[in-house]
C-alpha cells in the first residue's frame, strides 16, 4: 500500500483501514462519496464481518489499551456522519458482524436490515424478532431455508431478505 500508516494489523496478515486516522478516513469518505454520486446510489450497506478488537489492541501499548478503539469508533461515526451530510436522506444499512454493532450511536445513523448472520434457525429468528422489536420498530432478517415454518418465522420481521441462491435449479419457484 502507499500509506501503511493508515492500516492496522501485523505485517503479512489481514489489515484494517484505521478510521481513527484522519487522512485514511478522508480518503475513504472521498472514495465512497464519489461512488455514491457517480452511480446514483441512495442506500449504503456497511457490511463489516471482522472482529476489530485484536487490530485495536495490537496497535496500543500496554498502558494505553483502548485508545485506538476509541479513536477508531469516533472516526467510524464521523465517517457515517459525513456521508449523511453529503447525501441527505440516504439510508445506511448496518450489517455488521452478526449484529454486534447494534449500539445506540450506530442505530442513530443506520438501520439493521440484516440484524444477525444467524438466519438458519426458525426459533432463533423468532427470538431475535421478539427481543429486538421492543427496542427497534424497524429491523430486518433473512433466511436461506425453504420450509414453511422457517419462512414464517423470518417473515414476522418488518424487513425480510430472501437469501437463496437463485442459480440453484433445484429451488421450488412455485413454492416461493
Model regions: which residues?
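Active-site-proximal substrate-binding groove within the catalytic cores of carbohydrate-active enzymes
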Residues: 50, 76-176
Amino acid at each position: 500500500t502507499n500509506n501503511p500508516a493508515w492500516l492496522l494489523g501485523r505485517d503479512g496478515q489481514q489489515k484494517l483501514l484505521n478510521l481513527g486516522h484522519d487522512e485514511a478516513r478522508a480518503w475513504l469518505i472521498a472514495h465512497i462519496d464519489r461512488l455514491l454520486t457517480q452511480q446514483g446510489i441512495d442506500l449504503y450497506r456497511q457490511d463489516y464481518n471482522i472482529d476489530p478488537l485484536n487490530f485495536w489492541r495490537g496497535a496500543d501499548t500496554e498502558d494505553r489499551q483502548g485508545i485506538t478503539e476509541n479513536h477508531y469508533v469516533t472516526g467510524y461515526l464521523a465517517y457515517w456522519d459525513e456521508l449523511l451530510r453529503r447525501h441527505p436522506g440516504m439510508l445506511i444499512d448496518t450489517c455488521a458482524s452478526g449484529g454486534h454493532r447494534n449500539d445506540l450511536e450506530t442505530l442513530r445513523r443506520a438501520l439493521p436490515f440484516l440484524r444477525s448472520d444467524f438466519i438458519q434457525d426458525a426459533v432463533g429468528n423468532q427470538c431475535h424478532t421478539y427481543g429486538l422489536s421492543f427496542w427497534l420498530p424497524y429491523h430486518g432478517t433473512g433466511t436461506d431455508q425453504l420450509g414453511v415454518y422457517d419462512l414464517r418465522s423470518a417473515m414476522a420481521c418488518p424487513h425480510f431478505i430472501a437469501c437463496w441462491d437463485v442459480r440453484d435449479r433445484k429451488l421450488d419457484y412455485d413454492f416461493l
